[in-house]
Amino acid sequence: MNKKQKVILSLLQEIDEICRRNKIEYYLSPRLTLCAVEGHPFPQNPMFGVVLMKTADMERFRLAVDEDPREKRALESMKSHKWFSGFYLRYTNTDTLCLNLDNTRDYAFPGIGVNIFPLRTPVASVKAERRLSRDENAWTELCHINYADRNFRSRVNRTIMRLQCMITGRQGQAAHLYDRLVRACQQPGANKYILKRRKQTTIFPAEIFAESKRVTLEGAELQVPAKTAEYLTISYGKNYKDAKEPRYVTPIALVVSARVSYTQFWKESGNFEKYCKERMKNARKLARSRRHKDYFNECWDYVEFCGERLNLSVSYEKQKDYIKNLYKNEDYMTLERVFRPYFKMMQKSLQKNGLFAEDEEIFDIYVDVLEKTGKTVQRSKIGTLI
């Protein structure tokens, strides 16, 4: 194991010690559980240090650490840091460095750490679930504005969140949202738990976490769900034993060190705040240019599509008399062969909620041929748009 992996393992051991002392249940993430159970090597990715706790236990852990803080350790959450982007905790070794230069505000203590994600219960009502999900997504997008959705609803939700931040203060709003999530996501008697990550949501039956057991990971005794097979099957599928860790390459924007602390890095970087502002400004420009590129590509694809339609319509215009003659003689087998390119273009047009009907006579013949040859699926789709 390298020094960064050893730091993560030591943090996991400390979390285990705190949980055992305060009788708090926790579970290694599916990735770490797989490493422990199947003997796979410890992950290279410094962001793979993850444990799971039920929402109530996660809050108890936060309070326990706040009451008895440790030297060179920090526990961050939305309760303590106004730019913390999600509903989870991060237990950090402050004598190390793990900094994403594109998101320098994410953590107040950007060292190597272990993320503690909550196992949420479903919210009591659908209405409350929608409202809470809306506010949580708006907060996350506000923290990572360069990667936020640009649709109208997301913009409105972010605007409402900004107004709330102006009224209560950003830190007050973050803490208030955290408290709401803690209250809403620990309903008694739940039959399932939801693990919500930034890009993935996984649902586990409640019985998986009914009991726990001890396993050994790189010589350290840690805790996992007793039903490890079911736990890993839900996460990786039936062939979880064959799951391999993808080859890890440190991203260009990520600075990681187990020897240098983030405070030393800041000092040696000179005016770090100015550097961060410039980098964020450049990231914003890059995100904007990517959106423009995506829009341009979409427009160009549509231009090419319209060109294909036009060329095909000219081709069928030249065959119009031939098609009418085949239709008059009820030669539907030949017509089906003639209309194959027309069928493909109609499929593309229907995907864009449109019709390929440049010539009304040919279109009417085509629709009748669909009925006669039994292609009722496309015929019904056309019928809904006529």
Question: Model-found features: residue ranges?
Answer:
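Alpha-helical repeat scaffolds
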Residues: 299-303, 334-345, 376-386
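Active-site nucleotide-donor binding segment shared across nucleotidyl transfer reactions
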Residues: 16-49, 53-59, 207
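Alpha-helical junction/boundary sensor with strong preference for TPR arrays
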Residues: 306, 346-350
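Conserved catalytic core of two-metal-ion nucleotidyltransferases
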Residues: 1-20, 62-134, 138-235, 242-281
